[in-house]
Regions:
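N-terminal positive-inside, membrane-proximal cytosolic segments immediately preceding the first
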Residues: 1-14
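Hydrophobic membrane-insertion alpha-helices, especially the h-region
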Residues: 13-30
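Short extracytoplasmic/periplasmic juxtamembrane "stem" segments immediately C-terminal to an N-terminal membrane anchor
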Residues: 41-61
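Short cysteine clusters
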Residues: 99-102
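Extracytoplasmic electron-transfer domains, predominantly the class I c-type cytochrome c fold
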Residues: 84-85, 96, 106-185, 197
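Post-kinase regulatory C-tail/linker adjacent to protein kinase catalytic domains
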Residues: 189-197
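Electrostatic cytochrome c docking/interface patches
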Residues: 54-95, 134
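Perimembrane helix-loop junctions in membrane proteins
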Residues: 31-41
Length: 197
């Protein structure tokens, strides 16, 4: 073995690249199984038709979403294609309004306003229901998104982004689906909804 021979170093570099490429492919395939819709951490879009809760799992040592029985969003059950279209539109609304300039999603974004990763599960929506006169959490969220200035409860005010009823409903669908994603306990110390008897 001659360490001065460039062939030795070239062969070493090529074999290292090949081995690491195989490792990268294996890790990518493993990750896709966890992060794809319907994977181990990311539910199917139709989860918006179900009750979503957030409970501490002692075995894992963190909080995780718990998917329960039927609880259709806006009282209407949507099929897989309808749920995907609604969630895609909600994500587009969030991206087009640059919500990440003030909020965070999965820890990415600005920390000026609340993290929206588990926004659907936020116990504060019960207060917003009373303020907006809404009968349901989703109705309160829609009213808030359409007129955050009038419906504020804190000193900081979210600007009115001109969100329509349809856009607000799609955004709420996206936020409900997002709350069902298993984020391994992120965000930490997130509050819990009051369990219904």
């Amino acid at each position: 073995m001659n360490f001065d021979d460039p062939v030795f170093w070239r062969a070493g570099a090529i074999s290292t690249v090949l081995v690491m490429s195989v490792v990268l492919i294996m890790l990518t395939i493993d990750s896709l199984a966890a992060i794809s819709q319907g994977g181990s951490n990311v539910p199917f879009y139709t989860v918006i038709n179900q009750h979503i809760d957030y409970k501490f799992d002692a075995k894992r040592g963190n909080d995780m979403p718990v998917i329960g029985g039927p609880e259709p969003l806006f009282g209407k059950t949507v099929d897989a294609a309808g749920a995907e279209a609604l969630i895609d539109k909600g994500k587009l609304v969030i991206q087009s309004r640059a919500c990440i300039d003030c909020h965070t999603f999965f820890g990415n974004g600005a920390y000026f306003a609340p993290d929206l990763t588990k926004a659907w599960l936020d116990p504060a929506w019960e207060t917003w229901q009373a303020i907006t006169g809404a009968a349901t959490r989703e109705e309160a969220m829609v009213k808030f998104l359409m007129d955050p200035v009038t419906n504020r409860i804190w000193t900081r005010t979210m600007p009115n982004l001109g969100i329509t009823q349809q856009e607000a409903e799609a955004t709420v669908a996206y936020l409900k689906w997002l709350s069902a994603v298993d984020t391994n306990g992120f965000p930490p110390n997130f509050g819990h909804m009051q369990s219904k008897p």
